[in-house]
From Swiss-Prot:
Coiled coil (UniProt feature): none
Location(s) in or outside the cell: Membrane
Origin organism lineage: Bacteria, Bacillati, Actinomycetota, Actinomycetes, Mycobacteriales
A GO term from the CC aspect: extracellular region
Spans through the membrane: 23-43
Key word Membrane present: yes
Superkingdom of source: Bacteria
UniProt source species: Mycobacterium tuberculosis (strain ATCC 25618 / H37Rv)
Keywords: Membrane, Transmembrane, Transmembrane helix
Name of protein: Uncharacterized protein Rv2576c
């Protein structure tokens, strides 16, 4: 055997290398198996918030005043101090039988989801509102010249 090849016993294989290679293969295999369980869990993680859909309809054509929560306030005090940061206010036309739909992403819709609609006519426009959270109807209300849907008492 040429000088510098092999180990002290003259063997080409060094037992230290033989033991190290299977350990490295086992480590890589174990790490791959562990990550394959983690990556799908990360991909399935819940989104940051809940998809909230507000729908308003009426039986008459009119200019409606609509307000809905578009973002979670950090507290009721923050909301009371400046509700315009969290609630959208619109003065918009609405056609009888044609729904107006607005969406928001809220972290805590059971605390903050609300939509109101009102309008003035000599005949009540018969408003209807609905709140859907993550595809499930959670509130539905009917009203005459105005209506409010919320997930908690205001």
């Amino acid at each position: 055997m040429p000088a510098g090849v092999g180990n002290a016993s003259g063997s080409v294989l060094d037992m230290t290398s033989v033991r190290t290679v299977p350990s490295a293969v086992a480590l890589v295999t174990f790490a791959g198996a562990a990550l394959s369980g983690v990556i799908p869990a990360i991909a399935r993680a819940d989104p940051v918030g809940h998809q909230v859909t507000y729908t308003v309809t009426t039986t008459s054509d009119l200019m409606a005043n609509i307000r809905y929560m578009s973002a979670d306030p950090p507290s009721m005090a923050a909301f009371n101090a400046d509700s315009s940061k969290y609630m959208i206010t619109l003065h918009t036309p609405i056609a009888g039988g044609q729904p107006l739909v607005y969406t928001a992403t809220l972290a805590n819709p059971s605390q903050w989801a609300i939509v109101t609609a009102s309008g003035g006519l000599r005949v009540n426009p018969e408003f209807h509102c609905e709140i859907v959270v993550d595809g499930q109807v959670v509130v539905s209300q009917d009203g005459g010249s105005g209506v409010q849907c919320s997930t908690r008492p205001w």
